Amino acid sequence: MTRRSFIESTGATYATLMAWGLLKPAPADAFDLPANGRKDGKARKVVILGAGLAGLTTAYELGKLGYDCTVLEARKRSGGRVWTVRGGTKETEIGGSEQTCKFVDGQYFNGGAARIPHNHQLTLHYCRELGVPLEIFNGSNESAWLYNDGGSGALANKRMRIREYHSDLRGYTSELLAKALDQSSLDQQLTKEDVEKLIDFLKNEGDLNTGKLYKGTNRRGYKTPPGAGAVPGDLADPYGLTDYLRSGYMQPVFYNNGDYTFEQHATLLQPVGGMDAIPRAFEKKLAGKIQFNAPVKELRKTENGVRVVYQKDGKPTELTAEFCVCALPLPVLKKLDSDLSPMVKRAADFIPYMKTGKIGLQFKRRFWEEDDAIYGGISRTNMDINQIWYPSFGLLGQKGVLIGYYNFYSRAEAVGDLPLAGREKLALEQGYKLHPQYPQEFENSFSLAWQKIPYNEGGWAVYDDAVRRKYYPALLEPDGNIYLAGEHTTYLTAWMAGAFTSARRVVEALHARVGEYTKK
């Protein structure tokens, strides 16, 4: 077996990457806590609300320490916002919109969490420990499109490759700086030798000519690509600096992209076959511990711990335990009938959640690869669709599913308020401006608005400094024997790493507290 075929057959598993030294183990993430059993030898009971990643991780780690855990999950699946949509997936949104996914076998999109940063070591630790194979997620592609809808001048209503945009703006910026240096306006700060070194850097950074002018180079691509014989290739002409300044292309949506975000620096990863491979791996470790279709109705403190009332087979059922770890999103928690402290209830009421939505579009052929040479990555626009994501799996296949929009805030709210057919229509009409192939190749769609997904009602917690100072501390301390977990109790909101690290924090705190009991 060749090295290439081995990678393809394993999906570039974590073990493979580690064996070749491309990824290193993270021993700091090993969780080694001392056992703190009861003096009577019985396991301490813990009820965990929610089978998202925070709840699953809590049950998994406490289970290893000998606790008797029960996880109550309102849905028939685990994962929470780690949700892979594939053929047969069904969802009824708040408001009654129902849909069933019609994707062909092997096609999917991740409706929630969709990428793993290389620097989220705890997430990678659990993928390693649970045996979840990973592959590359291509989040940055210079061949993807930018499209400026509206504006003025030569670039109004025009799409361009990201590489053209980056090359032109780096070139013109470097040209302006090089000219300023040549005018000796910085002599007081820099020596002559310093100026020469900086100009050399700018000439390389902006790919300037000998006259320190930017005229466009092969960095931005070709009109006609190079070929054999007497075919050197024809360079594409750059757009003018004034064209950029007069257009809408100077908006943050175009230049403030993931390339500048710490968590989105390459390399990014994804589980082979869908992000739900992670919660499914936890499920295998927690066999018999998760009760599905069990929405929680009440949470009460008792003299000896907690009492939880939940629905099972249409009937109210009661469960008591020594401790409760509540891993419900705050929009769900605030509707729960409970005797949580006023501070916790106030935090749940006032900490906002992101409105966000996605749509998966299945096409007959992968025209973005065949026609546009786009293999993974993200196109961006100032329209309501905001982003188009291209799949990093199934390359060179026949059919494909791309994410036709991924939007936030008021745009996500407006699009989410549309009927399902209206969301699809908007995605196709606006996406057509980047990909004219849409009408001919489209087959079906599946959309979701997280603010309308039952048992979530939002994408992730959104903090500003004031909200963080005023409400966040109440989420971090136990309320009697009730602990809170979830990305909303971390500074890693919106990431799976937030769920993981919150669970670890709660397990440590609860276990240390039990240790104090044991000593008495």
Go through each PLM region and give its residues.
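Active-site/ligand-binding neighborhood in enzyme catalytic cores
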Residues: 143, 150, 174-295, 303-305, ...
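N-terminal glycine-rich phosphate/pyrophosphate-binding loop and immediately adjacent elements
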Residues: 34-176
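N-terminal secretory signal peptides and thylakoid transit peptides that target proteins
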Residues: 1-14
